[in-house]
């Protein structure tokens, strides 16, 4: 399945800050955060047991235990992602076409090195390595390297024409496998990047030397993560990221400061995260309202993403109480309101609450502005929120069974599939598991994977209007009380009302106190 990072409605224009000039040299990111204590469950989270076995890891594993996000997306999506608890190795390969200007490659190599593995001082924001070390609270340290340039026998125009005559994905997949074969045959040491069986490269990022096609996000020359056709005769790409060198930013060629937002977003897919923006061109409803790294390539990852990746776990509300949480981006504190049948894992439906502060990984983005068009066609400016406030999400991350990897027709939610006749081959031999919902609704009534609930209500989202400071819940705001618009909120799974309503009772720069009472 193609996963593309798109400029919303193709009208977005980054209005960048002014930077001076820095020397053209690779300065590696050397800081290594000591992992924070970000786990708040009272007991260790057990594997999620599903009622029927499903296939994982390209049909090589049949299991009824879910232990990680990487396992989940290896089933229905057939994607090879970083495994939880293992070192994340990222292999970055610059790809030239036959007609590329080789005189620029030395400089571009240094820009790529700084974008992926460089010190923050060489980037307008963070490098990929520094971002994920900070976003994971020290639980992840991306290691890797930028190889020599691989030169395709095709010109860029020939590759583009081939993609137009067929499809872009087979072309990029073929090039990805060419790259891996070239590395293998040139005695490049692939040890750190191969799966245990030695068949596939995990964490391959190809940076091609050609401008991106901003007018066509389905073009060969765009940014996405995809799975390649697997080849058993030599190590193959399996899953790879694909982006233009020009995503380093136009000014990088002049001042040597690199923009990395696109690369960071695509590496999020290599960890297994989904896009949170609406990918239906005909729908303007934006479930996270541009306000996330997996939406508009901005800021820190949200609590749902970090919960999936086990970088942090929540405080679970099980009785009326007050809970004080600190800045989410700085500490990993967040709260979960469960349903009565919560299974104790990220793969369920619940409410998440986090304290947003324009600090840490949210700091740089807070002072940028972006052009976009709303549902009516009106040009607007998105100012990344710069206030302190509470973000509340409705997450429906329940898993479903599917009988086909390439057809997105679900059989049922996994929790419902308990009475199937085990002798029925339809449900016994070809089951795959994936998320039942995504963030690309055709209609506002569709269930969503990750929905940022606005303090202003839903009208802005329905009209394609971006998040703002007013999206955040502020001091003395309520959620689920008779005086607010969420009093009649119900969960999709059970139809239950919220078990607790909440009030933002105290708010300081570093922490916020949330008071939970029985729903009135």
Question: What do the PLM-derived regions correspond to, one by one?
Answer:
Residues 24-263, 274-282, 393-520:
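Propeptide-to-catalytic entry region of secreted or membrane-anchored zinc metalloproteases
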Residues 5-21:
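Sec-dependent N-terminal signal peptides of Gram-positive bacterial secreted proteins and lipoproteins
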Residues 322-325, 335-337, 353, 392, ...:
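Hydrophobic beta-strand residues in large extracellular and virion-surface proteins
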Residues 1-2:
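N-terminal secretory signal peptides that target proteins for export/translocation
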Residues 368-374, 382-390:
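Short coil-to-beta strand junction motifs in C2/discoidin
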Residues 87-89, 348, 387:
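Extracytoplasmic
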Residues 135, 203-205, 209-369, 398:
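Extracellular hydrolytic enzyme modules, especially secreted metalloproteases
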């Amino acid at each position: 399945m193609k996963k593309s990072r798109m400029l919303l409605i193709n009208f977005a224009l980054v209005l960048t800050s002014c930077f001076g000039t820095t020397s053209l040299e690779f300065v590696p990111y050397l800081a290594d955060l000591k992992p924070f204590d970000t786990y708040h469950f009272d007991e260790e989270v057990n594997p999620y047991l599903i009622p029927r076995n499903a296939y994982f890891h390209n049909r090589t594993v049949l299991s009824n235990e879910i232990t990680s996000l990487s396992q989940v997306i290896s089933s229905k999506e057939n994607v090879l992602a970083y495994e939880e608890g293992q070192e994340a190795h990222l292999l970055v390969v610059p790809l030239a076409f036959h007609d590329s200007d080789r005189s620029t490659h030395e400089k571009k190599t240094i820009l790529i090195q700084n974008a992926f593995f460089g010190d923050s001082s060489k980037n307008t924001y963070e490098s990929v390595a520094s971002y994920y070390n900070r976003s994971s609270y020290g639980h992840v340290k991306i290691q890797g390297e930028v190889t020599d340039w691989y030169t395709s026998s095709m010109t860029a125009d020939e590759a583009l024409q081939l993609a137009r005559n067929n499809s872009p994905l087979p072309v990029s997949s073929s090039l990805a496998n060419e790259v891996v074969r070239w590395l293998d045959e040139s005695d490049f040491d692939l040890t750190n990047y191969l799966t245990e069986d030695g068949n596939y490269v995990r964490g391959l990022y190809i940076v091609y030397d050609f401008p991106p096609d901003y007018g066509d996000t389905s073009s060969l020359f765009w940014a996405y993560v995809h799975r390649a056709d697997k080849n058993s005769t030599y190590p193959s790409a399996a899953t790879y990221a694909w982006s233009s060198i020009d995503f380093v930013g136009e000014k990088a060629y002049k001042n040597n400061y690199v923009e990395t937002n696109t690369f960071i977003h695509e590496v999020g897919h290599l960890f297994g995260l989904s896009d949170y923006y609406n990918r239906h061109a005909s729908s303007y409803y934006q479930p996270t309202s541009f306000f996330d790294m997996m939406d508009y390539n901005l800021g820190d990852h949200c609590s749902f993403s970090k919960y999936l990746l086990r970088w942090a776990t929540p405080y679970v509300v099980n009785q009326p109480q007050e809970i004080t949480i600190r800045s989410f981006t700085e500490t990993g504190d967040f709260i979960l309101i469960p349903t009565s049948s919560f299974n104790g894992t990220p793969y369920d439906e619940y409410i998440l609450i986090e304290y947003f502060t324009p600090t840490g990984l949210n700091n740089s983005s807070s002072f940028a502005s972006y052009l976009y068009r709303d549902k009516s066609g009106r040009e607007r400016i998105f100012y990344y929120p710069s206030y302190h406030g509470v973000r509340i999400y409705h997450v429906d991350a329940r898993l479903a069974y599917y009988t086909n990897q390439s057809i997105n027709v679900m059989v049922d939610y996994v929790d419902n599939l308990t009475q199937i006749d085990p002798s029925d081959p339809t449900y016994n031999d070809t089951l795959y598991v994936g998320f039942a919902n995504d963030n690309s609704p055709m209609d506002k009534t569709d269930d969503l994977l990750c929905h940022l609930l606005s303090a202003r209500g839903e009208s802005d989202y329905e009209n394609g209007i971006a998040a703002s400071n007013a999206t955040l819940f502020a001091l003395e705001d309520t959620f689920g009380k008779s005086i607010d618009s969420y009093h009649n909120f119900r969960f999709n799974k059970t139809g239950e009302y919220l078990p607790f309503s909440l009030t933002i009772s105290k708010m300081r720069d570093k922490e916020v106190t949330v008071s939970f009472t029985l729903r009135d």
